[in-house]
From Swiss-Prot:
Positions of Zn(2+) binding: 144, 148, 224
Enzyme class: hydrolase
NCBIfam families: PRK05457.1 (NF003965)
Textual note on the cofactor: Binds 1 zinc ion per subunit.
Name this polypeptide is given: Protease HtpX homolog
The EC number(s) this enzyme carries: 3.4.24.-
Gene Ontology MF terms in the entry: metalloendopeptidase activity; zinc ion binding
Gene transcribed to yield this protein: htpX
Compartment(s): Cell inner membrane
Record key words, sorted: Cell inner membrane, Cell membrane, Hydrolase, Membrane, Metal-binding, Metalloprotease, Protease, Transmembrane, Transmembrane helix, Zinc
Requisite cofactors: Zn(2+)
GO cellular component annotations of the record: plasma membrane
Family membership noted in the UniProt record: Belongs to the peptidase M48B family.
Lineage of source species: Bacteria, Pseudomonadati, Chlorobiota, Chlorobiia, Chlorobiales
Active-site feature positions: 145
Length: 291
């Protein structure tokens, strides 16, 4: 669950920084100097929107390591680490992928995969998961994460987020301009945006950004089903994945940092719309009904 929420929070932070920078540099004054230039605004929104999204993608692996304190296994220190690295290597070869970095972090049961591309990825598992599951179940979890990489889920979510960012920036500024025009005095003929524009655009950018996360989480839930199915294919059997999900259902799944929530093996939210993962029961049912 970690992967997506980390991506969302990083994306929001980058977007706000880029937006503020654009204001400081006078881009908004250029766009609104002689009325709102819709064409230029849309181009500006796309540049900032996709730029922020891809910057977040490039930072994803570094941010994941930092936020969890994950330790990349350079030289396995014990038999468990040897097995972990070998298992990820075998699964990656089956999927036709380059070997990802393998990491361990302290925490309750969970795991995640992230990275800017299939050839520069990271698979991390918690000490809690390694201690509470048997090796067949852990292998299934690793297969699920490798399937995420193979499916290109981070790039897919980046493109979705880029489109949503574009609309967030565009709509927030259109509405902010309308509010500013309404509040502006009839005697003000400067044409420059006032304080109402600055405040409104920031407020609406945050509000629409939160609403956009609902769409991202919807796609994240769909990708979880695909990763479960991909794990079953890599293992040649759906039962280990089902057993792993059932085991997770009986454990207190680890809460990954908010910014990483959507890339874990387990996750969810208080509200279904903001949940990065489907219910475990639904995932098990989907695997059991698959042919």
């Amino acid at each position: 669950m970690k992967r997506v929420v980390l991506f969302l929070f990083t994306n929001l932070a980058v977007m706000l920084v880029l937006s503020v920078s654009a204001r400081v540099l006078g881009v908004d004054r250029f766009l609104t100097g002689n009325g709102l230039d819709m064409g230029m605004l849309l181009l500006f929104a796309a540049l900032i929107g996709f730029g922020g999204s891809f910057i977040s993608l490039l930072m994803s692996k570094t941010m994941a390591k930092w936020s969890t304190g994950a330790r990349v296994i350079q030289q396995p220190a014990n038999q468990n680490e040897v097995w972990l690295v070998d298992t990820v290597s075998q699964l990656s070869k089956k999927a036709g992928l380059a070997m990802p970095e393998v990491a361990i972090y302290d925490g309750a049961p969970n795991a995640f995969a992230t990275g800017p591309s299939k050839s520069r990825s990271l698979v991390a598992v918690s000490t809690g998961l390694l201690q509470s599951m048997d090796r067949k179940q852990v292998e299934a979890v690793l297969a699920h994460e490798v399937a995420h990489i193979d499916n290109g889920d981070m790039v897919t979510l980046t493109l979705i987020q880029g489109v949503l960012n574009t609309f967030v920036i565009f709509l927030s500024r259109v509405i902010a301009y309308a509010i500013d025009s309404f509040l502006r005095s009839d005697d003000d003929e400067s044409g420059s945006p006032g304080i109402g524009y600055w405040i409104s655009s920031i407020i609406f950018e945050i509000m629409f950004g939160i609403l956009a996360s609902v769409v991202v989480m919807y796609f994240s839930r769909k990708r979880e089903y695909r990763a479960d199915a991909g794990a079953a294919v890599l293992l040649g059997d759906r039962r280990p994945m089902i057993d792993a999900l059932r085991a997770l259902g009986g454990l207190q799944a680890g809460q990954l940092p908010k910014e990483m929530a959507a890339s874990g093996i387990a996750g969810g939210g208080m509200m279904a719309l903001f949940s990065s993962h489907p219910p475990l029961e639904s995932r098990i049912a989907a695997l059991e009904s698959a042919r």
